[in-house]
A protein has these predicted regions:
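DPxDG-like acidic metal-binding loop motif
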Residues: 63-90, 95
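N-terminal beta-alpha supersecondary unit
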Residues: 1-64, 243, 251, 264-265, ...
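Gly/Ser/Thr-rich beta-alpha loop segments that engage phosphate groups in nucleotides
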Residues: 12, 34, 65-69, 73, ...
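Surface "functional belts" at beta-alpha junctions
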Residues: 22, 34, 89-187, 215, ...
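Stable alpha-helical structural segments in soluble proteins, enriched in small hydrophobic residues
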Residues: 46-50, 85, 103, 189-200
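Acyltransferase
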Residues: 178-249
């Protein structure tokens, strides 16, 4: 089983190739470039270095949110371009579950992936022994701390909101806690790929046409048009027409980059029909 993992939900772009319980290769890039500049070259490089080709893939696992609206769209465009071009199934992986997967081996510890949602809020969820407890949500950091203080036990935090709110957490938490180190702090495509492998075994793959992103909060443009408070937003699903309307680098992220497709393909560029 060969799976390509893609995560572009935050500042870090990450791709990984995973086969039969082994991470063959993983690249992550967080150097200030846009994901449209880094993602496809990283995908091409990972196939070149491992000697595998696109046509060998059993599936592509991609982080489907929550996260940066623009970043998620670029990852989706990349994954959909490959999936539609080479008839490869897609696997939708929660960004928060992917973060929790970084430290799944931790036993009897509440794991809290927290992503900066701005406006003093975080995207978060709680996991125990690898299982989601409750729901994914966007919540104020102080409200989150108050909730966690009502949960006896050990707690572990990771995600890009840790450096943003670390001082607040240290000042207000009354339960035992730890923070992730640099190696596990941010999103990793290998975790996305491993979760994708589990989903594929359960028959949860979808086609490129049926893949949709999920957001906990509405995009900024929609939020500005509505008067309701942020907490009132439910998880919303991507409008399939959004990718068609997206201009410039977001929509073109997966276009015309040379990737070895394997034997039998005369044109090994990613098709334009995203």
């Amino acid at each position: 089983m060969l799976i390509l993992g893609i995560d572009s939900s935050g500042h870090t772009a990450s791709v990984a190739l995973y086969a039969d319980d082994v991470v063959l290769s993983e690249y992550s890039c967080n150097i200030g470039l846009t994901h449209s500049q880094t993602l496809l070259p990283m995908v091409a490089e990972i196939f070149s270095r491992t000697g595998h080709t696109v046509d060998e893939l059993d599936a592509i696992a991609v982080s489907a949110g929550p996260g940066s609206f623009t970043g998620l769209r670029i990852g989706a465009a990349t994954a959909k371009g490959l999936a539609l071009g080479y008839d490869i199934p897609l696997l939708e992986v929660s960004t928060l579950e992917g973060l929790a997967m970084n430290v799944r081996d931790m036993d009897a510890v509440y794991v809290h992936p927290i992503m900066d949602a701005r406006r003093s809020q975080v995207y978060t969820a709680t996991f125990l022994d690898g299982q989601l407890i409750g729901e994914e949500e966007a919540i104020g950091i102080e409200e989150l701390v108050a909730n966690i203080n009502q949960m006896p036990g050990k707690h572990f935090f990771l995600g890009d909101a840790v450096p943003v709110y670390r001082s607040c957490l240290e000042a207000q938490l009354s339960v035992p806690y730890r923070f992730a180190g640099p190696g596990n702090l941010l999103q990793r495509a290998s975790s996305v790929a491993m979760l994708g492998a589990e989903q594929l075994a359960l028959g949860k793959a979808v086609s490129g046409k049926d893949f949709h992103l999920s957001y906990i909060r509405k995009p900024q443009a929609e939020r500005e048009r509505e008067a309701a408070g942020l907490r009132e937003y439910d998880i919303t699903h991507e409008d399939p027409n959004l990718l068609k309307k997206a201009a410039g680098e977001d929509r073109l992220a997966a276009r015309n980059y040379k990737i070895d497709a394997g034997p039998g393909y005369e044109d090994d560029t990613v098709p334009e029909n995203l």
